[in-house]
Amino acid sequence: MKIFSTKRNKIMVLVILLVIVFFFGLKSYFKTDEQNAEAVEQTNPLALNWLSYNEGLALAEKENKYVLIDFYTDWCGYCKKMDKETYSKDEVKKILNENFVVVKVNAESENKVIENGEEITERELARLYQVSGYPTTWFLESNHSRVAPLPGYVTTEQFIPVLNYIGEGWYKSITFKEYSEKI
C-alpha cells in the first residue's frame, strides 16, 4: 500500500473522506427536513385559528357560527393538558372548524377587549363570565348570547358530544341528557 506511505497522502485521503461524509450528511439533513414538512402537512391538515375575543366575536357574527371561548391561565396545568390532549385531536378540530370560531382569553391578562361598548381587561372579562376555575370553556351563539359554560379539563371523548350538541343546535330543543341518550 504505497498510496498511504507518505504523511501527505494520508492527510489528503482523510480530507477527501471528510468532504464526502460532510456532503452526504448535508444532503440527508435537508432531505429529512423536506420529508418532515410534507409529513406534517399530510398527517395534520386541520389547524385551529385561535382568535382574540373581539376578532372572534366579529368573525362568528359574520360567518354565523358559534363561539367557543377558552378561558385559561399561563400557570394552569390542566389548560395545557387540554390544549395538548383535547384541542389537538383531528376530530375535535374538524367539528370546531365547521361550527365554531375559537377564541382564547388569558384570564389573568391586562390585555384590553371591548365588551358591551366598554374597554375592559381580559381579567375583568373572565369575571363577567363568572370564571372561577381553569380551564373554563364558554359557548356563545353567533349574536354573542351565552349558551353555557363548561368548567374544567375535558377529555376528547367527553368534549365531542358537547361540541356536537351545541354546534348542531340541539341545545335549543332538548336537554343534554336527552341528546346523550339519543346518540
Language-model segments: residues:
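N-terminal targeting signals for export/organelle localization
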Residues: 1-46
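A short beta-strand-turn-helix
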Residues: 49-66, 96
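Short active-site neighborhood of thiol/selenol oxidoreductases, capturing the structured segment around
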Residues: 62-77, 102
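Solvent-exposed coil/turn segments that connect beta secondary-structure elements
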Residues: 74, 107-110, 142-143, 155
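Typically the conserved alpha-helix immediately C-terminal to a functionally engaged Cys/Sec
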Residues: 78-97
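Non-catalytic, surface beta->alpha helical segment in thiol-disulfide oxidoreductase systems
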Residues: 85-87, 124-173
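Structural alpha/beta surface segment adjacent to cysteine/selenocysteine redox centers
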Residues: 105-132
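Flexible coil segments in periplasmic/lumen-exposed cytochrome c-class electron-transfer proteins
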Residues: 170-183
